[in-house]
Amino acid sequence: ENDADGSTPPTVEKIGSKIKSKAPCMVLFCAFEQLHYYIELGERYGFKHYIPLVFRKNFSAQVLKANMKIVGNCEYGLVLYKDKLPKFNNDGQMIFNCFDWVRDTKDVPKIHPTQKPIALLERLIEIFTDRGDVVIDPCAGSGSTLLAAAQCGRNAYGFEIKKDFYREATEKVLNNIQPSLF
């Protein structure tokens, strides 16, 4: 997750060059304007291919501009992968690169300003990993990726440098699983 202040941790540089599995992929969320930057950065670290993702919301954060212009209701992302297509669990169904963004229910605490819905994260984890695989979230923020991975039967490791987010995620979201959150 990007930090609320707009800074983006060096995900691709730090983790991308260390991935050794046969067909790894990296899924990242970003702003539309960042897509090209992350494609180029991925290529620099061996992720030669990508699949663009669009996450369609039924709401917009730009509500104050609704009477002045068309407002955005999408978030964007990329699936970066090396030489081989990543693992792909589609159960024989066509999967489009545009996903509906369904908000979490009120029982999932909102901890981070860029927190992603658990159901969306579960869907992506189920598509690109198998039970028992490892999911890494280098910007764990709310802990939602770790929770989604655990609920899908995956092992997960998360890293968070902001102590307040770590504490809240540990207390409110991850209290029923055994996370490796640093």
Protein language model features and the residues they cover:
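Class I S-adenosyl-L-methionine-dependent methyltransferase module
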Residues: 174-182
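Core catalytic lobe of class I
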Residues: 1-158, 162-166
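Conserved SAM-binding loop
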Residues: 169-170
